[in-house]
Amino acid sequence: MTKDEDFKLLKIQTFSLRVNIHCEGCNKKVKKLLQRIEGVCHVKIEAEHQKVTVSGSVDSATLINKLVKAGKHAELWSPNPNQNQPQKPKTNDFIKNVNQKGQKQGSAKSGIEACKPKNGPKGAAFVAEEDGDGSEEEDGDVQFPKPANQQQQQNVVNAKKNSGGAAMNNGNNGVNAASKKVNQKQSNHNQNTQQVMAAMRMRTAGKMSTGVEANEIGALMGLAGFNGATNAVNHPPNGIQQQLQAPPLNNVNGVTNHNLTNSNGGMMMNMNGYNNHHPMNMQSRQMMHQPQQMMYQRSSFVPASSNGYYYNYTPSPYSYYPYYPYASDQYQQQSSHSHATNMSSEEDAGNNNSCNIM
């Protein structure tokens, strides 16, 4: 009997336990406690993961009971705590994926439908406008280029008009064709009139530069003695008509008559004889005339012809008047007369008093 007991095979097993370890003291306490148990061969503790590996011929139940009696909660180690629960079939995830794919396809279809033109009054208006443009091209009418902003505004106005006509046509079944034709003719007529006005504006803008040449020709005619040719320059874009008379170059007084509709007043002449030029002359002929200065805008000083030549006469633009160091003739006559009277009085006094030293 004893021989059989001595040679009994020992079954060595390895268990992994989860034990609450918070500090170094807990680590040492658990290790000592497990090593004292009979049949434990090796103990390994991982404090970070609270994992204890025990190898020996001992059941896991005895190890857990010993640790619980010592005040340490212990259980078998499992990497996933919910591993023991039966796994449910993943039907919910499959349903969610199918729903998401259906939503994506629906959003793509809605985006494509949003890009398509709707069958509304505005769409019909634009289609009608395109048809009207085609009819104009077939008729062979001359079309002038229009600015981008004006074209956009006209398109909006025509769209509003056509939308109103379409709304009325829905109620009246018998007047649909006639009202559409009338609206198209009115819109075409408005477009033609606006195109003609734009072309006229472009032509008048191109002819604005010819006013300078006409002004120069009028000045040359003034040299020949025709007193300048009147040149009328019309400005239809601004709605203002101005008539400008070219200044003759042979004018002696240097005063030019500007016939303006905005009622400019008469202009004072400066002392040098240069007139206040029109802005067109200031732009085109800058080197032919002297620029205006404020200090020259006063009347010139004209000396009297009866007094003869004055000493130190200074012409304008200086504001002070000449200084005369010599006395005038009248002052000299008065002084000589007074001196003669004084000498006569002195002689009378000398005769009375005795001699006078001359």
From Swiss-Prot:
Protein name per the record: Heavy metal-associated isoprenylated plant protein 37
Modified residues (Cysteine methyl ester): C355
Binding site for a metal cation: C23, C26
Biased composition (Acidic residues): 128-141
Species, as recorded: Arabidopsis thaliana (Mouse-ear cress)
Keyword Lipoprotein appears in the UniProt entry: yes
Disulfide bridge map: none
InterPro entries, alphabetized: HMA_dom, HMA_dom_sf
Chain residues carrying a lipid of type S-farnesyl cysteine: C355
Signal peptide: none
Pfam families xrefs: HMA
Origin: domain of life: Eukaryota
Location of the region described as Disordered in the Swiss-Prot/TrEMBL record: 100-194, 332-358
Keyword Cell division: no
Task of the protein: Heavy-metal-binding protein.
